[in-house]
A protein has these predicted regions:
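A glycine- and small-residue-enriched flexible loop/hinge signal that marks low-structured segments
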Residues: 1-190, 232-233
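A generic structural signal for short, non-catalytic loop/turn and secondary-structure boundary residues
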Residues: 12, 146, 223, 242-244
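Residue-level marker of positions within ordered structural domains that often coincide
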Residues: 22, 216, 256
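Glycine-rich loops and low-complexity Gly/Arg-rich segments
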Residues: 41-45, 178, 211, 274-279
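Acidic, low-complexity glycine/serine/threonine-rich segments
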Residues: 172-235
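C-terminal edge-of-domain segments
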Residues: 236-284
Length: 284
């Protein structure tokens, strides 16, 4: 919670997206409500299976839209143990870099530098497959799974996601929310040195046109879809605010959704048997 607060309008300006973890074990004394599927070992309660992770997330309010929640941990070939958030952030930064710094793509289904899932030294869990990983995803938990002949980050959602219960499409995918933050941060970075200059009509139009140009460029590279619109409306800029030197531009746009799943509907037909009868092509 402290990280989320710290990452909200840093220095009064900048938006940041938090990647955090659910624990694989916690001191039993810190648990107020029973965690479904958990087991006690000594003075600790193990959060070492899918059901326990989902229950712990719900009980402890890991549902903020500005964060991505990861579970479990991972271990590499040399025995080093990493938090899921570390592995996810590594993939996220690499993915951003491949897109020229634009957070248009989720780190989900990107390579993870581990050789196994890790649930803590006291756990007997040997791991889970993609089916159970999808159960975690449905609860807004990002995980690590063996898929496509390699270990990969799995889950494109924010912590606010819960299958069938999301009313705000903006918070479904991590890249959607991060794109909104990116656009807001870019606006502030672009015009920071203009603050306290005379706000002429020409400058107002320059800002609007430049932001529209940037929005159209994001469409061109696939970061946004449709036709984003930048506005400067009288209804959003009252005389009282203008007198104070406060000006508001509006942006409306649609981040490109990830290809979360694809289905090919395969049907059988006996129409092909017709080729055995009638004139064959080229027959004389």
């Amino acid at each position: 919670e402290a990280m989320i607060t710290a990452g909200t309008k840093i220095n009064g300006h900048w938006d940041a997206f938090v990647v955090s973890d659910l624990p694989v074990s916690v001191p039993t004394s810190t648990i107020d409500s029973a965690v479904v599927g958990s087991t006690e070992v000594g003075s600790n309660t193990l959060i070492d299976n899918v059901d326990a992770a989902i229950s712990y997330k719900d009980l402890n309010g890991f549902t903020n839209e500005r964060t991505k929640v990861c579970w479990p941990m991972g271990i590499d070939s040399s025995g080093r143990v990493f938090h899921g958030s570390t592995i996810t952030m590594w993939a996220m930064l690499n993915t951003d870099e491949s897109n020229n710094g634009i957070p248009m793509e989720s780190p989900s289904n990107k390579d993870a530098f581990i050789t196994a899932q890790y649930f803590g030294p006291d756990s007997k869990n040997q791991g889970f497959d993609q089916t159970r990983a999808n159960d975690l995803n449905a609860a807004g938990i990002t995980t690590i799974v063996y898929w496509g002949a390699r270990w990969a980050i799995w889950g494109p959602h924010t912590a606010a996601y819960k299958f069938g219960a999301v009313t705000d499409p903006r918070v479904i995918f991590d890249n959607s929310l991060r794109m909104m933050m990116y656009i807001s941060n870019s606006f502030q970075q672009e015009w920071a040195m203009t603050i306290d200059e005379p706000m002429t009509r020409a400058l107002s139009d320059t800002i609007k046109n430049r932001e529209q140009e940037k929005a159209d460029a994001l469409v061109a590279v696939g970061a946004l879809i449709g036709k984003p619109v930048v506005t400067f409306e009288e209804s959003e800029n009252s005389t009282a605010e203008l007198v104070e030197g406060n000006f508001v531009w509006g942006f409306e746009g649609t981040p490109t959704p990830p290809f979360k799943s694809g289905t090919l509907q395969v049907a059988y037909t006996d129409a092909g048997f017709d080729t055995y009868f009638g004139e064959a092509e080229g027959e004389v």
